[in-house]
């Protein structure tokens, strides 16, 4: 997962 193209939830998991 690319953190520049995803957003991070409060739990720290990345979503597309």
Curated annotation (Swiss-Prot):
Belongs to the thaumatin family. The keyword Secreted applies. Coiled coil: none annotated. It comes from the Eukaryota. Its main location: secreted. It is found in: Secreted; Secreted, Cell wall. This is Thaumatin-like protein 4. Keywords: Cell wall, Disulfide bond, Secreted. It comes from Taxus baccata (English yew). The keyword Transmembrane helix does not apply. GO terms for cellular component: extracellular region.
